[in-house]
Amino acid sequence: MHLQPREQEKLMIVVAADLARRRQARGLQLNYPEAVAIISYELMEGARDGRSVAELMSWGTTILNRDDVQEGIAEMIPEVQVEATFPDGTKLITVHTPIR
């Protein structure tokens, strides 16, 4: 299987998010890359499911909360941006202050 660089990046997000969810299920608080991976993955999947950019921007702030991440991580992530594939093409989703 030959994947384009963009497809490889998306696959890495999926793998990182899966690992992060497993750690979260064990009761561990998430670090920076784990938190970003989960939020990015959920946004990409929401786009694939047909949700709008506006809906995802709002929903993106509810995926994780401060209790889910290690101390100081929420402040390290002022925004998350991810290019996602929607039924009508690729669009950029920006979620400001995703961890509240």
UniProtKB/Swiss-Prot annotation:
Heterotrimer of UreA (gamma), UreB (beta) and UreC (alpha) subunits. Three heterotrimers associate to form the active enzyme. Keywords: Cytoplasm, Hydrolase. It comes from Corynebacterium efficiens (strain DSM 44549 / YS-314 / AJ 12310 / JCM 11189 / NBRC 100395). It is found in: Cytoplasm. One of its GO terms (cellular component) is cytoplasm. One of its GO terms (biological process) is urea catabolic process. GO terms for molecular function: nickel cation binding; urease activity. The keyword Phosphoprotein does not apply. Signal peptide: none annotated. InterPro entries: Urease_gamma (IPR012010), Urease_gamma/gamma-beta_su (IPR002026), Urease_gamma_sf (IPR036463), Urease_subunit (IPR050069). The keyword Hydrolase applies. This is Urease subunit gamma. Its EC number is 3.5.1.5. Pathway: Nitrogen metabolism; urea degradation; CO(2) and NH(3) from urea (urease route): step 1/1. Belongs to the urease gamma subunit family. It catalyses: urea + 2 H2O + H(+) = hydrogencarbonate + 2 NH4(+). SUPFAM superfamilies: Urease, gamma-subunit. Pfam families: Urease_gamma.
